[in-house]
C-alpha cells in the first residue's frame, strides 16, 4: 500500500508506478531504515505519541524484521512497494497491526531517506577504509621485498632516472593515504542526523533531535531543516573521493599493464588474474588491470551525473534526488571491488629483477648524475646540462652507454671530468645520492617502509 493517496481520485498508471518506484535499488537501505525507525519510535515516547509498551512492541517487531532482512535482503524485491520506507511500514503493520500506522507520526520520507542514506554511507565508509588499508599493506610488503630491484623511472613514458620497484610501490601508498584522509574528512561532515526535520520545515513534535542523533550514532543533529532534507553534499563528496581514488587505481593499473607487456617485461601477472584469447592460444591478457582502468570512467560519470542533477534544484526536496542512490551505490561498489582486485593482482605478481636492472641501464638514465658531477666541479648547471646533452648525442652515435665512453672522449667536452667520473655513473650511485626525504636512496626507502609498516600495524 502506498503511503499517500487520500487526496487522489484516480489510481496511478502502472507505467508511472514502475517509473516512480525506487524499491529495486533503495532496498539496500532496509537495515538503515529499520534502525532509524527504532530510534524514531523511542522519540515518540517522549512526546506522548507512543506508550512504553507500544514502543516495545514496535521495536520487537522491527528487530524481527531486521533479522529477516539480514538473512535474505533480496526477498524485499518480491514486493511491489513503492520504496523501502513503504515496504518497512507495510511489513511492520503485518506484524503488529494498526499500531504500526502510528510510527510515521511527525516524520517525512524526506528526512527519513536523508537519514537512511547517511547511515548507509557511514557503514560503507568503514568497508572502504579497510580495503584501502589492505591495499596499502600489500604495497608495503611488495616494496619491502623489492628494495634492491632497480628499474627505470619514467617521464613522458621515456626512461628518465633509475628508481627501485619499492619506490614505485610507495608512491601508490602515498596516493592511498590521501584517499583515506579524504574519506575520513567526508565522514566528519556527513556525521550529522537529519531525522526530525520533517518534509522541510521541521517536525511539529517537540522531539530532542540531539538525543535522537546520539541514538543513531551521529555526532550531532543538523541545524537547518530546509537544508537537511535537500543536502546531498555527502553524496557528491563520496563520489569525488571515489573518482580521485579510481584515478589512482587506473594509473596503478596502467603502470602494471605496461610493466607486464612484452615491450617492458618487468613483471609477470599471476594466472589467477589474467585470461586468454579465444583465437590466439599464446595470449595472457591483463584483464583485471584493464577492467580497473576501464571502470574509472564509470565512477567519474556518476559524479558528473549527480552534479548535473543537483545544480538547478530549488529548495527543498525534489524527486530528482531519488537519482542520488543508483550512481552512488554503483560507484562505491566499483571502488571497493577495484581496491580488492588491485590487492589481489599485486599479491601474485612476479618481479623480473634482472630485466628491470637491464632496462635501467638503458636510455642514459644516469645523464643527470653526470650533470650534477660537473656542477660539483664548479660548472654552472645550465652549462653542465648542455655539455651532458652533447655527450649523450655522441654516445648515441657510437651506440655506447655513458660509462662505456673512454675518459679521453669525455674530456673533449669538459676538462673538469677526471677519473672519478665513473664512480658516479653506476646505477647504485644514482640511487645512493637521492638522500633527501622522499628520495629513492635505499636509506630513505627503508625509512619510508618502516614508517608505513608502523602506521599500518604490519609486523
From Swiss-Prot:
One of its GO terms (cellular component) is cytosol. It comes from Photorhabdus laumondii subsp. laumondii (strain DSM 15139 / CIP 105565 / TT01). It is an enzyme of class 4 (lyase). Keywords: Amino-acid biosynthesis, Arginine biosynthesis, Cytoplasm, Lyase. It is found in: Cytoplasm. GO terms for molecular function: argininosuccinate lyase activity. This is Argininosuccinate lyase. Pathway: Amino-acid biosynthesis; L-arginine biosynthesis; L-arginine from L-ornithine and carbamoyl phosphate: step 3/3. Belongs to the lyase 1 family. Argininosuccinate lyase subfamily. Its main location: cytoplasm. InterPro entries: Arg_succ_lyase_C, Argininosuccinate_lyase, Fumarase/histidase_N, Fumarate_lyase_CS, Fumarate_lyase_fam, Fumarate_lyase_N, L-Aspartase-like. It catalyses: 2-(N(omega)-L-arginino)succinate = fumarate + L-arginine.
Amino acid at each position: 500500500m502506498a503511503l499517500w493517496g487520500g487526496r487522489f481520485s484516480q489510481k496511478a498508471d502502472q507505467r508511472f508506478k514502475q517509473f516512480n518506484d525506487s524499491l529495486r535499488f533503495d532496498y539496500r537501505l532496509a537495515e538503515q531504515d529499520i534502525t532509524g525507525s527504532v530510534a524514531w519510535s523511542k522519540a515518540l515516547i517522549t512526546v506522548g505519541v507512543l506508550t512504553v509498551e507500544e514502543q516495545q512492541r514496535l521495536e520487537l517487531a522491527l528487530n524481527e524484521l531486521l533479522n529477516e532482512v539480514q538473512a535474505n535482503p533480496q526477498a524485499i524485491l518480491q514486493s511491489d512497494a513503492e520504496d523501502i520506507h513503504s515496504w518497512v511500514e507495510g511489513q511492520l503493520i503485518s506484524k503488529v497491526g494498526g499500531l504500526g500506522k502510528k510510527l510515521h507520526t511527525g516524520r517525512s520520507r524526506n528526512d527519513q531517506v536523508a537519514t537512511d542514506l547517511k547511515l548507509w554511507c557511514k557503514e560503507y565508509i568503514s568497508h572502504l577504509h579497510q580495503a584501502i588499508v589492505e591495499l596499502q599493506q600489500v604495497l608495503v610488503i611488495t616494496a619491502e621485498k623489492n628494495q634492491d630491484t632497480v628499474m627505470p623511472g619514467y617521464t613522458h613514458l621515456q626512461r628518465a632516472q633509475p628508481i627501485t620497484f619499492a619506490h614505485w610501490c610507495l608512491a601508490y601508498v602515498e596516493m592511498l593515504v590521501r584517499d583515506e584522509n579524504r574519506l575520513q574528512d567526508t565522514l566528519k561532515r556527513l556525521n550529522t542526523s537529519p531525522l526530525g526535520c520533517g518534509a522541510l520545515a521541521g517536525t511539529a513534535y517537540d522531539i530532542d533531535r540531539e538525543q535522537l542523533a546520539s541514538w543513531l550514532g551521529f555526532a550531532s543533529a543538523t541545524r537547518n531543516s530546509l537544508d537537511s532534507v535537500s543536502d546531498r553534499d555527502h553524496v557528491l563528496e563520496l563520489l569525488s573521493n571515489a573518482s580521485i581514488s579510481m584515478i589512482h587505481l587506473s594509473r596503478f593499473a596502467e603502470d602494471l599493464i605496461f610493466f607486464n607487456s612484452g615491450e617492458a617485461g618487468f613483471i609477470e601477472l599471476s594466472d589467477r588474474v589474467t585470461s586468454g584469447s579465444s583465437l590466439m592460444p599464446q595470449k595472457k591478457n591483463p584483464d583485471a588491470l584493464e577492467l580497473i582502468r576501464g571502470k574509472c570512467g564509470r565512477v567519474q560519470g556518476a559524479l558528473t551525473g549527480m552534479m548535473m542533477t543537483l545544480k538547478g534544484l530549488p529548495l527543498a526536496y525534489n524527486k530528482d534526488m531519488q537519482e542520488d542512490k543508483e550512481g552512488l551505490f554503483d560507484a562505491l561498489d566499483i571502488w571497493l571491488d577495484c581496491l580488492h582486485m588491485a590487492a589481489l593482482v599485486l599479491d601474485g605478481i612476479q618481479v623480473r629483477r634482472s630485466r628491470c636492472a637491464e632496462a635501467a641501464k638503458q636510455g642514459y638514465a644516469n645523464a643527470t648524475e653526470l650533470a650534477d658531477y660537473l656542477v660539483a666541479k664548479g660548472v654552472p648547471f645550465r652549462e653542465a646540462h648542455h655539455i651532458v646533452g652533447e655527450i649523450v648525442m655522441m654516445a648515441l652515435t657510437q651506440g655506447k652507454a655513458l660509462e662505456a665512453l673512454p675518459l679521453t672522449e669525455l674530456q673533449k667536452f669538459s676538462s673538469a671530468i677526471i677519473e672519478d667520473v665513473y664512480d658516479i655513473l653506476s646505477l647504485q650511485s644514482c640511487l645512493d645520492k637521492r638522500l633527501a626525504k622522499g628520495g629513492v636512496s635505499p636509506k630513505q626507502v627503508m625509512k619510508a617502509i618502516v614508517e608505513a609498516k608502523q602506521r599500518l600495524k604490519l609486523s
